[in-house]
Amino acid sequence: MMVESKTPLLDTVNTPEDLRKLDPSQLRQFADELRTETINAVSVTGGHLGAGLGVVELTVALHYVFNTPADRLIWDVGHQCYPHKILTGRRDRIRTLRMGGGLSGFTKRAESEYDPFGAGHSSTSISAALGMAVGRDQLGHKNHVICVIGDGSISAGMAYEAMNNAGAMNSRMIVILNDNDMSIAPPVGAMSGYLSRLISSRQYRGLRELGKQVAERLPRPLQEAARRAEEYARGFVTGGTLFEEMGFYYVGPIDGHNLDHLLPVLENIRDDQGTGPVLIHAVTQKGRGYGPAERSADKLHAVSKFDVITGAQAKAKANAPSYTRVFADSLIQEAEADSRVVAITAAMPSGTGLDLFEKRFPDRTYDVGIAEQHAVTFAAGLAAEGLKPFCAIYSTFLQRAYDQVVHDVCIQNLPVRFAIDRAGLVGSDGCTHAGSFDVAYLGCVPNIVIMAAADEAELKHMVATAAAYDHGPIAVRYPRGEGVGLEMPERGQVLEIGKGRIVKEGTKVAILSLGTRLKEALLAAEDLNARGLSTTVADARFAKPIDEALIRRLAQDHEVLITVEEGSIGGFGSYVLHFLAQSGLLDQGLKVRPMVLPDIFQDQDAPAKQYDEAGLNARHIVETALKALGTGLAAETPAARA
């Protein structure tokens, strides 16, 4: 007996070309089936749920009205792209989302022609869309360029830079503001839907243009009065004055879940022959159509595998606290002892653990929104006034504020504390979120101190060290995930700046680890010792300043020195090699082997598999030592595999 499909319409659609064969009256059912498929898929894989559910109707309408992929459709960030992926020939692989060898959790150019621009970080879509629109015009093409950006992402400076530029140009592009927080929109309903359809219509645009031509014949004061009156009237009923002032033709707000509103507005804009940018303001609900996600939009923004009926997430029992939790608890402890400790996050309070800090110290917590550049300089201002700011930002997002780190913090030697979460490889979020580069891009800047926690106890000590350090900027990096299960000290101890530690003594091979590869270094030492190769293991603790006395000792007392780090080329290993070369410690035959992440962008997978692919596990350290000593052959290198 055949089981009746729960998605009969969706089963007939593999690409948007198939979708456009449906009658408009079928689209409501199609959207419901697409939402069901999205929920079922994410329940198996985990991922970003709420954002995608909020744009199901918008996704259907955009692909139905516009001729994708010839018409470019860009999704900002990419959190909301799962329905788009299902609809663009990837349904058969949707249950591989964020897995090794599977679909990326974000849009990705290499994955589909329907992903014209990749994402992962926020607020890039308007800039990319404008570039594509100008490129189209230069080449004499006629396709549309559309980008979808959320009300959170549009608050970032880059989005306003792009809008400011776009408003001064004649290139036609369409920006869809996906407002799922009601932070900008006035109430939506039948009247606003009618006004949006009216304002987007060719007749209205024609009358407006005629009015401008008539006004141009009036004396200049009357021209200005007419312009302001028209803007005031439109702003009164639509709320789009800000975007109009930036040079956009504003349409909205419209109900982003009402296909009867979406379709005619999009068709009107598609068919209009005008020039310049258009902004369509669509109000949506995050988690739409799935009760648990609607009730807890923040908790079901990003989820692990979950039960579709209850929404309960299947989280494995933790063997140790997460590094993020250890950081938060340690910072709370320091703040209880010192009222000058304050915390800054750039729209990631729960991701960085500062939601816990905020519960304890609401008046000492600052969420500045998606504004990493501002966050860093804001922290610099706090430090200049004698406070102790901890700026908690993921490694990958701190890249966005590099000039502020250099110009506003380090040149002025202001004591800003950087808590760099998600350092190293991050698993299912893939290359856009990997924290591979911070040691390299911070280590070349004067005045900054850089620490890397080997385990959760070390992280607690490093938070205490950062709180006590008032001589300039200081950073502590730590990974995503759980600690190693150590007994935690009651209080963090202040570490001596630039001093590492010997963890295991040996005589022939020295392994100098920075960060949480220390556990793998100790496992490698056990293997090497079992082979009769006495091995020292040291924890560098500091990437800058490096412990020159420790490195000198390791170089002079061992035949082989291996550095291991969860970072790119140009980082800690380079600093060690530079010191060894400058000190003449390479002149007596010391064999130095730096082990770093391969010089590639690694795709998503389980973190353990990523590090195995990167060649940074215990067996790789053993192979490196054996090859250096000439007593064994190393396995194929990550670079060769790539």
Swiss-Prot record:
Instruction: Name any cofactors this protein relies on.
Output: Mg(2+); thiamine diphosphate
Which biological pathway? Metabolic intermediate biosynthesis; 1-deoxy-D-xylulose 5-phosphate biosynthesis; 1-deoxy-D-xylulose 5-phosphate from D-glyceraldehyde 3-phosphate and pyruvate: step 1/1
| Binding residues annotated for thiamine diphosphate, in chain numbering | 79, 120-122, 152-153, 180, 290, 372
**Subunit structure and binding partners:** Homodimer.
Family membership noted in the UniProt record: Belongs to the transketolase family. DXPS subfamily.
Tell me which InterPro entries the record gives: Dxylulose-5-P_synthase, THDP-binding, Transketo_C/PFOR_II, Transketolase-like_Pyr-bd, Transketolase_C, Transketolase_CS
What's the top EC group for this one?
Answer: transferase
Enzyme nomenclature, EC number: 2.2.1.7
- SMART domains, alphabetically? Transket_pyr (SM00861)
Residues the record lists as binding Mg(2+)? 151, 180
Record key words, sorted:
Isoprene biosynthesis, Magnesium, Metal-binding, Thiamine biosynthesis, Thiamine pyrophosphate, Transferase
Q: Which residues belong to the signal peptide in this entry?
A: none
Cofactor notes: Binds 1 Mg(2+) ion per subunit. Binds 1 thiamine pyrophosphate per subunit.
KW Magnesium (keyword) present: yes
Q: Which GO terms describe its molecular function?
A: 1-deoxy-D-xylulose-5-phosphate synthase activity; magnesium ion binding; thiamine pyrophosphate binding
Quickly give the catalysed reaction: D-glyceraldehyde 3-phosphate + pyruvate + H(+) = 1-deoxy-D-xylulose 5-phosphate + CO2
Tree of life domain: Bacteria
Query: What does this gene product do?
Result: Catalyzes the acyloin condensation reaction between C atoms 2 and 3 of pyruvate and glyceraldehyde 3-phosphate to yield 1-deoxy-D-xylulose-5-phosphate (DXP).
- Protein name (Swiss-Prot/TrEMBL): 1-deoxy-D-xylulose-5-phosphate synthase
Mind listing the GO biological process terms from this record? 1-deoxy-D-xylulose 5-phosphate biosynthetic process; glyceraldehyde-3-phosphate metabolic process; terpenoid biosynthetic process; thiamine biosynthetic process
